Amino acid sequence: MAGLRLGPLLRHVDWESGTSATVWVETDRACTAEVRCPGGAGGSAPTFCVVGHHYALVVVTGLAPGSATTYEVLLDGERVWPLADSSQPPSTIRTPPVPASGAVVAFGSCRWAAPAVGESDPVGPDVLDTLSARLAADPEAERPDVLLFLGDQVYADETSADTRAWIARHRRAAGTGSAAPPDQVADYEEYTHLYDESWGDPELRWLLSTVPSCMIFDDHDVIDDWNTSAAWVADMRATPWWHERITSGLMSYWVYQHLGNLSPAELAEDTVYAAVLAAGDGTEVLRAFAERADADPATVRWSYRRDFGRTRLLMVDTRAARVLEEQHRTMLDAEEAAWLRTQAFDDPGGVDHLLVGTSLPWLLPPMVHFAEGWHAALCRGERGPRWARFGEWLRRRADLEHWAAFTSSFERLTETIAEVGRADAAPATVCVLSGDVHHAYVAEPVWTAGQQPRSRVFQFTCSPLHNSVPTAIRAGFRFGWSRLANSIGHLLARHGRVARPVIRWERSGGPWFGNQLMTLTLRGRTARLRLEMASAGAKQGRRGTDRTGARLIGVIDRSLTDGS
């Protein structure tokens, strides 16, 4: 009898017709996976195989718009979900009414796997586990229409003690991986263990089975500072274990994260997916694809678009699509940048809210922005070869690789946002959603006279979901918003011969530190922002608590538009 190894994950829900969804599962052997709903809705798919693991992405059809439909998962006709001993409510697929009146979008990034039940948690309660417990306690309460995961869903280079022990046993048994770091994953099998550890968490597993999700990678999904510079790439390609690491990282990302980002129509047109399904064993097909994606990133698009009624999400790849030639560095290659502009301007008048998902923040604390521009200038050779060598050394130690470090890309993104916001049929809001920096804040551009867009424009940064930041770094981020820090930043920019940014911006909220989640409630042309943080110490069993007694506390609840 086939067993359910991981999942189910509810991924894509159709907002155009409100009648279909996709559900992802991993099984322990080849079988037919079926999703069955009351009333006849459902779907089935045979599993496909990658490196001895079996997966299916089931397209569920026959759903009713504006409904909440429970479902179960069967493998070769035997029910495997809900789990026999589960105390969680049934998993449901919620479809929007058509036309949809709005969307509730929750987002964050950077999640270490939560420890097992009964173990202490050195970084505090997991905000997603805590959200899961609140929703399970009151299944009729408002829930997100979608969860956006903005990078570092797994940490391939910062593994837990349990995972390090498992890696050691795996490598001894397999006789492989001796050259790879003992505290980092080396191959596809080790990546599967990371996903088991992260998504097998009972609270998160139920949450992902009942709330749709969209995902994009950041560096730790592969390795810290992934694609930070051309010199870094050259050094890594000369490292004996790197080829298998990057190939396995991209293969596993495609299977565990990317496939579920696609609509059924996009899946039907995806040639790689078709080839994997057609092969008895899709390993070599997917390996060739991953090797090609690493060698020539322009051959693959990881970015994607989702429309939630009149809310548009553009999820942007800011890692694999970079141009790293030092004199012509860009965050996005020409084709990717053109795609972003095309999608942002498509169907003017048909979008009330434009969301740009980018793992790396667009607007940083001003001192950090100036420091990254200064540093990029040093690496280009503005102050000579000695400073350039220092710049490369610093780049690998200080994570100086956000939009600010790619000046032309920063300017082009700013221009795109401003043009969208100034259009006659501009959306009510343009919101850049980011993570990465292990704290949360809100920043708003300060436009010059006569350049004020019709749209309200925001940078919302929310991180981590479950991680930590050292005290010294907290102090640094707080200082980074100060006037003194701004003055220091200007001095650095002058040393690097860096021009002033094309806009100014100010912090209008934060910084906040903790395991946290931001939620946008978008109704018509109104918008509200809520930030909630997981707090320990509540009594066990209290409504809205998780297995450790944590609860979500409100940090801000703020209107972003008139009338909300």
Where are each of the predicted segments found?
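Metal-dependent phosphoester/phosphodiester hydrolase catalytic core
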Residues: 1-564
